Amino acid sequence: MKYPYSFEVLTNGKLVMRLPQEIKLMETFLGVEVSAFGDWILEEIHSVLNGKENYVVVNGNICGLEIRKDTTTVLDNLAEDGKGDFCEIETIELVDLIHIWQDKQKEFKKGKNKELK
């Protein structure tokens, strides 16, 4: 994994993933979009990685993705100026982060990790 990450439980009991500033928008993407549509998003990413599609655009509630084989751009769909915050991440790193987030969420929901180390 190229990017360091950690997990935090907020005072409201919600689990969040913390990431470096250059991919900070990924925190929102994982917490909102992947939490709701993770399997579908992974299918779309794999359709590009497997060569079925050259390029795929995915739009969620807050974030959008422009998926290419090498890199994916994560966009803030709620930006008032039409562009807003965005970050670029290697597509394979994105897949890894999604899997890490999904695994941690499942573990957390089972009650094994109400307090993180």
From Swiss-Prot:
GO cellular component, one term: cytoplasm
Keywords, in A-Z order: Cytoplasm
Subcellular localization: Cytoplasm
Domain of life assignment: Bacteria
Cytoplasm in keyword set: yes
Biological role: Immunity component of an LXG toxin-immunity module. Neutralizes the RNase activity of cognate toxin BC_0920. Probably does not have immunity protein activity on other toxins with the LXG domain.
Subunit comment: Probably interacts with cognate toxin BC_0920 but not with other non-cognate toxins. The interaction inhibits the toxic activity of BC_0920.
Record's protein name: Immunity protein BC_0921
Species for this entry: Bacillus cereus (strain ATCC 14579 / DSM 31 / CCUG 7414 / JCM 2152 / NBRC 15305 / NCIMB 9373 / NCTC 2599 / NRRL B-3711)
